Amino acid sequence: TLQVALDFLELSRALGAAREAWKGGATWIEAGTPLLKSEGLEAIRALRREFPKAYLIADTKTLDAGRTEFEAAAKAGANCATVCLTDSDSTVLECVEAGKNYGIDVCVDLLGLKGDRLIEVARQCEAWGAHHVSLHLPIDDQMRGLDATAQIQALRPHVTIPIAVAGGLNSETAPLAVKAGATIVIVGGAITKSADAAA
């Protein structure tokens, strides 16, 4: 599954990029964190009005008040929202509970986790009822030439839920992520900043 991340500050630019991506066949559209911080949940409402059949992801990166944030995202029209794992399991559990109550999928962002801890946490998230987990390669790691392939390969045998991968993916690296076991490939700038996003 291709997920197009709209990491813009202006809703008008995000909608323009979403239109092009939709024309190109992308059906999973993400209101990125910068867009949500700039425009709020109006970004989700606007995307839902324009793309009623899209699978909309609100990249809320929730850290606290999980039930409240997921309820708000669901009521705005999101199909899925994201939660970042912290030292407290309660936030993820509240998001999962809200997901059941409001019909919104939960993606747990595993940013920063590695090795055995990554596997342990991903398995726990699956047991709690998360829809999928996301391996997010930070920009700083990308600048050092790192990629998420090894993490995907290490994690895939241990969970049955989808694994999403994000961070610097393009037409050359996305197939490698899929080959490694990623189910959802999240691409932002390589699509939204291209001359022909529909292609």
List the model feature ranges, each with a label.
Residues 95, 178-179, 190-199:
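C-terminal helical cap(s) of enzyme catalytic domains, especially alpha/beta-barrels
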Residues 22, 74, 126, 178-179:
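Non-catalytic positions within long, well-ordered alpha-helices that form the structural scaffold/packing
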Residues 77-78, 180-182:
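As written
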Residues 1-6, 29-31, 56-60, 81-83, ...:
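Hydrophobic faces of well-ordered beta-strands that scaffold small-molecule active sites
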Residues 37-61, 94-111, 144-171, 199:
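Alpha-helix-loop-beta-strand connector modules within alpha/beta enzyme cores
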Residues 65-153, 157-158:
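Conserved anion-binding
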Residues 8-13, 33-38, 62-65, 87-90, ...:
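Short, small-residue-enriched loops and turns at beta-alpha junctions
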Residues 1-67, 124-128, 199:
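Conserved N-terminal beta1-alpha1 strand-loop-helix module at the mouth
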